[in-house]
Amino acid sequence: MNKTYLPSQGAIERNWYVVDAADQRLGRLATEIARVLRGKHKPTYTPHMDTGDFVIVINADKVTVTGRKASQKLYRRHSGRPGGMKVETFAHLQQRLPERIIEQAVKGMLPKNALGRQLFTKLKVYRGAEHPHQAQQPEVLSIQTFAGDDN
């Protein structure tokens, strides 16, 4: 019987990647980001360990959705008080807090446990093209969200 490979915490290399979300489709972009955060793109992937990389997303305000989702997709949050449900459309939330759209999409694709919360801290989302992580020298991660597109 083969023994499962288990990397030590010190042996795990964590890279920094920057992703440009301009004109990218939300769901397909979030899927790829979650895969990199989880570490599934590495041969050292282990399901119960954090083997993933850091991801910086820029131009979050320019992410797109297909069809009529801009006006029909709803984001809900609750204050915890009676009658405290707030409902917002994609278009309105994109104007107000575009970072939250990508954060919620990626968070829903991560495990719902302590490991998922730890992985989520490695996601950094910014509205514009600038980010404060130049010191980490992030590599550009190109994600193609439509077959045949050069996005």
Curated annotation (Swiss-Prot):
Keywords: Ribonucleoprotein, Ribosomal protein. GO terms for cellular component: cytosolic large ribosomal subunit. It holds the Pfam family Ribosomal_L13. SUPFAM superfamilies: Ribosomal protein L13. One of its GO terms (biological process) is negative regulation of translation. It comes from the Bacteria. One of its GO terms (molecular function) is structural constituent of ribosome. Part of the 50S ribosomal subunit. Belongs to the universal ribosomal protein uL13 family. This protein is one of the early assembly proteins of the 50S ribosomal subunit, although it is not seen to bind rRNA by itself. It is important during the early stages of 50S assembly. This is Large ribosomal subunit protein uL13. It comes from Synechococcus elongatus (strain ATCC 33912 / PCC 7942 / FACHB-805) (Anacystis nidulans R2).
